[in-house]
Amino acid sequence: MGLAAPRKKTKISHDPNNTSWSRSTDGFGHRILKAQGWTPGGFLGARNATHSDLFTTASASHIRVVLKDDTLGLGARPKRNLLDGPTGLDAFKGLLGRLNGKSDTQLEAEQQKRDDAKLARYAATKWQTVRFISGGLLVQEKDNATASPASQDLRVDFPRETSSHESENGMFKMEPMDSDSQEGGCATAKEEEGKKKEKKKKNKKGKELDMSSRKSREKKQEKRQKKRKISDCDGLDAETANRTSTNVLVAVANDKGTCLLASNGPATSRERQPMGRRIFRSRHIEQKKRALMDDKSLNEVFIILSH
């Protein structure tokens, strides 16, 4: 560029890698953790935790913040080509190990670890893997029998005292009762008998009341049925009286124009009693029948026809 190029002044700071904050012990977080019992190089959480076996040196190091600039999910790793990595490092590490005086068994163990890591990386890139962190093991609680053996030793089997009513063989004995106890028993028996008699009387009275109420209801129902029957009979008599009339046979002579009227005996045919809305229609039909059966009206009609 020469002398005509723009000049840029760059100043190298005292902490180019920005690691002074991690080494400082004057921060608030460092001081509060120390106050809570944490020591530098220790792990956070309970010391006797169930997952304490899984702690490594990374658990005591600082938290690394990684910028997420892709649309992958949390914890996802992009696929990497295994051929992009450096080749020949395994052989070079083995050569360095031999120069340092390591035995063949140690070299084989290290090589086996490297091969296992390669296989794990290949499987992780080819198939999705899920990493599980154990939260502890289920441990059976101690039973009361094993927890407190001393309490069982303290238990003493006391002999059960036989009552006066129970004999040595387990049979009950009948003791002679005193006169006072006999009188008390008689009084209680009499009271019980009196209560039973009162209950029986109450039950009898209740039954008699029920029977009387039933009889009164039955009588009322019978009276109502009788009234209905009487009213039905009256209506039927009136209808039959109106309906029973002489059957007229009308014969019209075509030549003379005279009519012959003949009457027969009373009709004994029974008709069904109309119900509901058909009552009015039946009345109208009966009026028409009466008009046809009337002698005078028929004669007038036939005279008009003859003229």
Swiss-Prot record:
Molecular function via GO: nucleic acid binding
Boundaries of every G-patch domain copy: 25-79
Keyword rRNA processing: yes
Bias-annotated ranges (Polar residues): 15-25
Composition-biased stretches (Basic and acidic residues): 154-168, 206-221
Gene Ontology BP annotations: rRNA processing
Keywords: Nucleus, Ribosome biogenesis, rRNA processing
Family indicated by similarity: Belongs to the PINX1 family.
Functional note: Involved in rRNA-processing at A0, A1 and A2 sites and negatively regulates telomerase.
Protein name as catalogued: Protein pxr1
